């Protein structure tokens, strides 16, 4: 059984962000990431950064592994406004999907169904400001793109990502 990931003891602090050095290697340590693939990885990295609220402070993309320095800020104490949520959703979802969510939120607010509006927010915000969710989504999306592009199946990464607390 896997040991739980060690997260910063202050990860639930309302003010202090956590910094992590994250590393992941390609399966069999094969040298498969060329310049265009690394550019696509950067694209997925920025998409996930814009959605999640996590900040990529630095990165190094190699042919068979990568290093990320991530800042995981605390979730805003008052949550996200509807506009902030929709802005983040635009980073990763299609315009028609975001328009549907915007319509749902508008209807819920008009009818004073705050519980329903909170449920809509919760469908997405549980994946924000979270190290594991950030890395899971980044690695999954890049793997799906890579596998589709190279007509392959299966895992692309050697094992689960490693993370070290920096601060």
Model-based region annotation:
Residues 1-167:
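Short catalytic/metal-binding and nucleic-acid-binding patches
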